[in-house]
């Protein structure tokens, strides 16, 4: 490659990236996933588009996609709270193993019938598209206030279901590439255990070593993110090299670092946020360039049948069977989890495996994977907001600061500055600072009014439009945000939680005359907390609800895993 070619490469790459960024606001206006915008830019720049760029280097696409996916999973792991594993780990693992196997089997049968394939080839197609995609799930769920059990289950499933898909794909390729040869059950079992076992072992062990290394190193602030990124990629590559799941490993590395007091944590997250955007853009641009849309015309009708068969039949059946042991999931939860079986980069990456192995029909597998991904993003991704509303799994948005940043006062510092803009509706307008009931361990560090820094004292009265900079820790974020930030509309809160909020220590007998409850001696002695435990089990989450005596009872407050109050919706409001 000469200097002119290199400059052309930089120019085209920068131009496509800039166009992707500038077109990204269209996703919210059109109601489509932003990943589809990036993919469309790549397709338009490709062989069949006005750009006319000829790109068919599957090895480069595989390299770029794996690198990008590793960064996305590292960032996603660092933003996942380990507390969510309390309610979502086992359901997510069931979906990541049994769910993938069931989806693969059903989709494989449909593929074999629709495309007149050998049943093993059909299963290979099912394995390729059988897992949900972490990049798509993290991207589309980011910023949404979903029921914790549902949201955490989807995120953990997407971060942990790739080992099963990779195991099935690699095993089926080995069988098809050596027709007549038998793969022993012990070999397959060992391969499966290596994928999961090494993935978990290297992820948690490597995460611990990397955490220790980061905290003992004295580096320039900008170097911590590079250390985490390079360390995560080393663990990812090592896991893959030894036969484990690098995808699972790097997700667990991020999870470990994100839930431990880590030096430079906020700076690391800021850098990873930008790197994740670059990775998503780069990955879907390259995959878009790789696709030749005209190749999809020959398979569009059976391809649609396969995609919708997976969306409407295979995925829902897999979800319902996988979640049978978990009674805490209601029918609405299961329906929404079924719908958010998003496919993205991972099926396309897996579809490259048969091409690199030189299998007959590999191009068909690749085109099918691409077709399924496009349909999934268009149908499931674009309707995600509507699906969440219909399933009633999206909570009213939590009040949050307009920005937050870390204060690296000392290693492992957990102090942050939260910035709030006061609206006219806040009760604290006109009140002196000394009358504010601030959470323990927090302090107003600065007040700005009309672009001017004030010198506040206890008698300083707050005005609408004031900007407050508050020093505190994440544990105080909810209380601070309730005090200062813009709260969701009252109608939105009452529509979800109901108009009446009841403390869980109240006895049902005291509520009976108010709400017309019919109680026997046993239920009359129960508190609301007893009723919630009876109906929802040991680990309820915010937004959980149940119907009892014609009233809808909704968990409206939690503290350290314990329900503190519930909302009551009357039948007419349900």
Swiss-Prot record:
Its name, as the record gives it, is K(+)/H(+) antiporter NhaP2
Q: Which spans are transmembrane here?
A: 6-26, 34-54, 58-78, 87-107, 109-129, 173-193, 196-216, 219-239, 242-262, 271-291, 299-319, 335-355, 359-379
Subcellular location, principal: membrane
Which SMART domains did the record assign? CorC_HlyC
Pfam families found in the cross-reference section: CorC_HlyC, Na_H_Exchanger, TrkA_C
Q: Which family does it belong to?
A: Belongs to the monovalent cation:proton antiporter 1 (CPA1) transporter (TC 2.A.36) family. NhaP2 subfamily.
Q: Which key words tag this protein in UniProt?
A: Antiport, Cell inner membrane, Cell membrane, Ion transport, Membrane, Potassium, Potassium transport, Transmembrane, Transmembrane helix, Transport
The topology of this chain with respect to the membrane is: Multi-pass membrane protein
Domain RCK C-terminal span(s) in chain numbering:
405-486
Cysteines paired by S-S bonds: none
Molecular function (GO) terms for this protein are: flavin adenine dinucleotide binding; potassium:proton antiporter activity
Q: Which reaction does it catalyse?
A: K(+)(in) + H(+)(out) = K(+)(out) + H(+)(in)
Which purpose does this protein serve, as stated in its record?
A: K(+)/H(+) antiporter that extrudes potassium in exchange for external protons and maintains the internal concentration of potassium under toxic levels.
**Does this entry carry the keyword Coiled coil?**
no
- GO biological process assignments: cell volume homeostasis; intracellular potassium ion homeostasis
User: InterPro entries from the entry?
Assistant: Cation/H_exchanger_TM (IPR006153), FAD-bd_PCMH-like_sf (IPR036318), Na+/solute_symporter_sf (IPR038770), NhaP2 (IPR023729), RCK_C (IPR006037), RCK_C_sf (IPR036721), Transptr-assoc_dom (IPR005170)
